[in-house]
Amino acid sequence: MNPSSVFLIVVATVAICLIVIQVYYIYENYDNIKEFNSTHSLLEYSKTINVFSLDRRIYDPNDHVHDVKQKWRCVNYDNNYVSVSIFGFKSDSGKNIKNFSTVDDCIDYTFSKSTHSNIFNPCINEDKSKDCNFLKSVL
């Protein structure tokens, strides 16, 4: 065998190995590929991805907090969901606690970077109020 045929055999072997590895990766991730395609199938012919979704890998207010009580979370309160932490409740303005009908709405509001909301802590002035007792119970 001359050197050129050895080189061609090596190149062909490497190409076949790369193809086999790619097929194996597709086989291993087939469920994830199907899920991604079904999620984004409506966008197949669109020029931009114009959907209302939050990529929580980029911004999460809990990323730099080490104390568990300081982390923001959504909890059920009076058949609505509210966003709470040790700092208090997320509020519309003043003492109006922001209520959400679904937990997804609460999560989207709490973890959206564009949302700069006020925080209302009922335990500062009235330590015995219903809101303060609830806040202490979930922390």
Curated annotation (Swiss-Prot):
InterPro entries: Poxvirus_A28
Record localization: Virion membrane
PTM comment, free text: Contains two intramolecular disulfide bonds. They are created by the viral disulfide bond formation pathway, a poxvirus-specific pathway that operates on the cytoplasmic side of the MV membranes.
UniProt keyword Transmembrane present: yes
Subcellular location, principal: virion
Protein name per its UniProtKB record: Envelope protein A28 homolog
Protein's membrane topology: Single-pass type II membrane protein
Keyword Transmembrane helix: yes
Disulfide bonds: none
Native species: Yaba-like disease virus
GO cellular component, one term: viral envelope
Membrane-spanning parts: 1-21
Ranges of the Virion surface topological domain: 22-139
Domain of life: Viruses
Entry keywords, A to Z: Disulfide bond, Fusion of virus membrane with host membrane, Late protein, Membrane, Signal-anchor, Transmembrane, Transmembrane helix, Viral envelope protein, Viral penetration into host cytoplasm, Virion, Virus entry into host cell
Function: Envelope protein required for virus entry into host cell and for cell-cell fusion (syncytium formation).
Recorded family membership: Belongs to the poxviridae A28 protein family.
Pfam family, one: Pox_A28
GO BP terms in the entry: membrane fusion involved in viral entry into host cell; symbiont entry into host cell
